[in-house]
Amino acid sequence: MKKRILALLCALALTVGLAGCVLSTPDTVGTIGDVEISSGLYLLAQFDAYQKAADLASSEQDASKVKSFLKETITVDADTEETATVSDYVAQQTLKNLETYAAIETRFDALGGQLTAEQEAQADSYAEQLMNQYGDTYKANGIGLETVKRFERILLKSTVLLDLVYGENGETPVSDADLTDYIENDLYYLSYVAVPLYNTTSYAFADDSQKALMLELAQGAMSSYNPTRPATAAAQQSAFQSAATAVLPDLYDVTATTDDPADASFSTSLLSDSDLDTSFTADGSADAIRALQMGEATAVQYSTLAMMMAVRLDPLQMSALDALRSTALSDMKSAELQDALAEYGASLPHSLDTSAMSKLPAKKIVNNSANSTTGN
């Protein structure tokens, strides 16, 4: 009988203990404005904040050791050399993330925004892809599929907000004149062909002298094109492609590549100034592209693996303004919108439950994946 009573008491204690564990994880941590912040969204915001801190870690700091890393000090602004403890930084960035999420939801609704069924399906599909790829990391941090779906819809709403605020029929529309000026002066419409700096069969890399020869040959072809370039963008693109195709056999000969020049793939891209720095990583290559006048061509080594022959074309001769509007608005106004959302989110009434948030501490973050992401 005593054994049965003891067993019953143990079972009861286990049941109470399990119930306590379930109840210790809140469904919500409160609201910002009228937007409810679920515990999952809080954990996602906190996990993203931790990843930002990890990106700022020095080579001697190990962000995979969460408890010790939270006590470390990181430099949060390289220009001012401002520092903060990781725990403080994560707390601040978590709140900023939540304020931005709430601001997006609130502004989107206030401006009459509504995602289409197709847009919602797109966001949900991407969320499922993220869970398939990073699900173990998300689950280890208490982040489920529904939370990731909500997050992806918030991101999509922020994109739609650009048009709701700055579009033709937006709250503060950007004029066609301003948009045209930005497209012509701040964006780079390139037609280009990439040339590998290695033999495409043996993968033997070109040495420095071979690279120099290839650039000399390519630049010679571009220098011959430039003085005789036509007046219109379409004609410039055609003449550039002819000049580039003509020199490809000589470039391929340097690395003994047997590819057919006729199979070379010419592409076009509309790039922002920041895109140039991201895409053209070899020294001086981004500045060489920036220096191009409309219709002018050049050759650059843009990475360790390839060189490029490129011509800058007038975007509005290649595409209609409406076709470029969303890309231009995104580049022109995204930073301004993000700043406005951050300020607006901070101004909304905060009704966050510190007790609930204390049950979701940063020290419980699991950071064992170098490839973890929140879709940003």
Stretches with model-predicted labels:
Residues 220-283:
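Peptidyl-prolyl cis-trans isomerase
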Residues 23-143:
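N-terminal targeting/tethering segments
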Residues 23-24, 33-39, 237, 241-248, ...:
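Cross-family detector of peptidyl-prolyl cis-trans isomerase
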Residues 23-25, 138-216, 276-376:
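PPIase-associated folding chaperone regions across multiple families
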Residues 61-78, 201-227:
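A solvent-exposed, charged loop/short amphipathic helix patch at secondary-structure junctions
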Residues 47-54, 95-116, 125-139, 153-170, ...:
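Sec-exported extracytoplasmic/periplasmic mature domains
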Residues 1-9:
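Positively charged n-region of N-terminal signal peptides that target proteins for export
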Residues 16-20:
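C-terminal motif of bacterial Sec signal peptides marking the signal peptidase cleavage site
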